Amino acid sequence: MMGFFLAVLAAFLFISPSWSAAASDQDNPIEIGHVSWSRDYQGALQASRHSGKPVFLFFQEVPGCLGCRTFGSQVLTHPLLVEAVEDEFIPVLVYNNRRTGMDAQLLNQYGEPSWNYQVIRFVDANERDLIPRRDRVWDIGSLAARMVAALKAADRSVPLYLSSLAVEYDTSHLQTAVFGMYCFWTGEYELGSIAGVVATEAGFYRGREVTLVTYHNDQLALKVLIGEAEDRQCARTVYLNDHSTAVQSRLKIKQFEPNEYQPAPASDQKKQLQQWLMDHRNLSLTMMQLTKLNSFLAGDPEAMLQWLSPRQLAQLGSR
């Protein structure tokens, strides 16, 4: 069941083809993504001391192997990740395949191997690691989670768009439940606002309207999710996989068969948000942002805007 839903989620994790890159540099070598990098290490330390922002110290091989190119093209091009690197940190690029100058000096100082896969260190103005070094951090979710940890270690506030990105891409903790109801528009609206819900999708199961809910099981227990659906009186039945059907609930608990589920047409998805999306069609949104905006637009527009990043908000204001 999880493989089926993660495939569906992956198809929607980032919506809309257009993004205003602001300070991002999209003419970079492929290995270093779209971040606007500094090569002035000492200047970065001074900027960190002045601002309190951590230094995002990126050791990378340029030109690099397939793994380095994949990291640059698939991770360091995500607009929200790029925004967080540029706005919440002082980004510095170190080439790990140069034998002289600042690059060689920093490789030696930090004990980093040359000609290696990418490594990111988060350091303060005194050149101390804010969190322990970790290798093999090669995906969006893992990097976003470490950025969150580094900001916390530096006693910096963590923007919601970044912490949400870490949750949304933490696929090892994403679970699903399917709620049968009289109206899947209501299901997306009601269930999408629950803390820990990552995504919703309107669909049909055995010909009946359902809402597919993807949630982060470290932030939201299944029994709490089902309890919320009960309290909001928006579901009659919950369809679960083999390992979850023992949950106690006033709702009917039934076994889920993935091959009998199909998504509703696009015209039925995120119904509360459709006109708003038409008015802001150039705005790029993750699936979690779409889910939250759909739930908060009608009843709490201020809460809705909290899910957007500063650059996204600036795009709204520039219409």
Q: What are these regions, as identified by a protein language model?
A:
Residues 35-39, 60-61, 81-103, 201-207:
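Thiol-based oxidoreductase modules, predominantly thioredoxin-like and allied folds used
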Residues 51-65, 91, 173-180:
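Short active-site neighborhood of thiol/selenol oxidoreductases, capturing the structured segment around
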Residues 144-319:
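Flexible coil/turn and secondary-structure edge motifs
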Residues 67-84, 186-198:
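Typically the conserved alpha-helix immediately C-terminal to a functionally engaged Cys/Sec
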Residues 4-17:
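Bacterial N-terminal signal peptides
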Residues 74, 114-156:
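Non-catalytic, surface beta->alpha helical segment in thiol-disulfide oxidoreductase systems
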Residues 54, 106-122, 209, 235-236:
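Structural micro-motif
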Residues 23-51, 149-156, 160-168:
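N-terminal leader/targeting and pre-domain segments
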